[in-house]
UniProtKB/Swiss-Prot annotation:
Source organism per UniProt: Drosophila simulans (Fruit fly)
SMART domains: Mab-21
UniProt-listed Pfam families: Mab-21 (PF03281), Mab-21_C (PF20266)
Molecular functions per Gene Ontology: 2',3'-cyclic GMP-AMP synthase activity; 3',2'-cyclic GMP-AMP synthase activity; ATP binding; double-stranded RNA binding; GTP binding; metal ion binding
Protein's name according to its UniProt entry: Cyclic GMP-AMP synthase-like receptor 1
Record-listed GTP binding positions: D205, R251, A252, S253, F254, Y255, E256, A257, E258
Family, per entry: Belongs to the mab-21 family.
Superkingdom of the organism of origin: Eukaryota
Chain segments annotated as coiled-coil in the UniProt record: none
Its EC number(s): 2.7.7.-
Cofactor or coenzyme needed: Mg(2+); Mn(2+)
Function: Nucleotidyltransferase that catalyzes the formation of cyclic GMP-AMP (3',2'-cGAMP) from ATP and GTP and plays a key role in innate immunity. Synthesizes 3',2'-cGAMP in a two-step reaction through production of the linear intermediate pppA(2'-5')pG. Acts as a key sensor of double-stranded RNA (dsRNA), the presence of dsRNA in the cytoplasm being a danger signal that triggers the immune responses.
Length: 393
């Protein structure tokens, strides 16, 4: 499918072409006014960079763990250039690499779709006799189970202690450009989150990630093709819900591969930003950013490359419909398969009432935009404004 076509007799004879362009102009103006973060980007980025460098350097000096740190990757909405409204959330993968890291035996977790188990047996056999790696071996002894499987909760407990020590050393504050900002630390899922209060107010999720090579990937053949020539992927110590003691299950994360898949698709990212902004404005927090990203990842592999040359407005409208279909409970229950393991339905965790609320909103939004796309009227500008602006008229 290379182009999006709306079935309307008015459209077929071209009589409403000017009106259609007017809706597009309205959406483009809303994008420039409410969605883009360009005017706020520099001060927040400067502040974030200072905090990132300080925390990373403190982690680097934190004994054995510091020897495992091998750089970081800005990910999430900001890293993907999908952040909307304000640059007030940053997601940072902190890469951990063990000695003999390529000897980690990775297995799919049969009891948790989308997760993997990291068997450290061969790693520990090799480094156990190496004097220079004795500190790492001793650390591993504390964070693996009897089967030598790495434990999420033990690793996170260690990192939580290190982050607490880091903030204490910093006095729970940081000075940037002569101004003091106060810092608060909370453990949020897999992330070690710092909330910044000061001239720039934002949060940073420091997410630990065991960096693994392409040779260690455990994917079905089709998903392996989507992984392509990507060199690395990560295993994230994401706690179970409810929390589980001695948890050997890690969430597989393919951020680098996803970034490659989203790259160079003309209107893809603008359309994602429109959908995220609408979600934010309407307070539909049960729809996560990764849900939206996943919806588009599936379209990347299903649509012809020329599809993304359609306008962001047209793609946005079509994705509203696909999202609503995925959320529907009747007549057939929809689903949003995890891109890297389609057996996992990412909407399965939502209650029926949450799904119904999201479905009703996005189906109504789709209807409104499709109607306005074929018949711009006095209400159209207000509809566009209310869809993307937190300020009411």
């Amino acid at each position: 499918m290379s182009s999006i076509r709306y079935h309307s007799s008015a459209f077929d004879d071209g009589s409403f072409s000017v009106m259609a362009r007017n809706l597009e102009n309205m959406v483009n103006r809303a994008n420039a006014q409410y969605v883009k973060i360009d005017k706020h980007r520099e001060p927040y980025t400067v502040h974030y960079n200072a905090l990132r460098d300080k925390v990373y350097s403190e982690w680097k000096e934190s004994g054995v763990l510091g020897t495992l740190l091998k750089g970081s990757t800005l990910c999430g909405g900001y890293g993907d250039k999908l952040k909307v409204s304000m640059p007030d959330e940053f997601d940072l993968l902190i890469h951990l690499v063990f000695p003999e890291n390529d000897k980690i035996i990775v297995k799919a977790d049969a009891s948790k779709k989308g997760n993997v188990i990291l068997d450290m047996t061969k790693v520990m056999e090799i480094i156990g006799s190496q004097e220079h790696n004795k500190p790492v071996f001793d650390l591993l002894q504390k964070i693996v189970n009897k089967k030598k499987q790495l434990l999420e909760d033990k690793l996170n407990s260690l990192l939580q202690s290190i982050m607490t020590q880091t903030l204490n050393k910093m006095g729970n504050q940081i000075e940037v450009a002569g101004r003091i900002s106060h810092l608060e630390y909370k453990k949020c899922g897999p992330a070690h989150t710092i909330f910044v209060k000061g001239p720039c107010e934002y949060s940073v999720d420091f997410v630990p990630a065991i960096r693994l090579s392409a040779a260690q990937v455990v994917l079905a053949p089709e998903q392996r093709r989507h992984f392509g020539g990507t060199l690395y992927w990560d295993a994230i110590p994401k706690p179970m819900k409810p929390a589980k003691t001695d948890n050997a299950s890690f969430r597989a994360s393919f951020y680098e591969a996803e970034r490659s898949l989203l790259l160079g698709k003309q209107s893809l990212k603008p359309a994602i930003r429109l959908l995220k902004q609408n979600r934010n404005v309407k307070n539909k927090a049960n729809l996560k950013s990764y849900h939206i990203k996943t919806l588009f990842l599936w379209q990347v592999v299903q649509q012809d490359a020329s599809y993304w040359s359609n306008s962001p407005k047209d793609i946005f409208i079509e994705m509203l419909g696909k999202l609503a279909d995925s959320l529907a409970l009747t007549p057939k229950k929809g689903k949003l398969p995890f891109f890297w393991d389609p057996k996992l339905d990412m909407f399965a965790e939502l209650t029926d009432s949450q799904r119904t609320d999201l479905f009703n909103h996005f189906r109504k939004c789709e209807y409104t935009f499709r109607k306005d796309n074929g018949n711009v009227n006095d209400c159209t500008e207000n509809n566009v404004h209310s869809s993307f602006s937190i300020n009411t008229r």
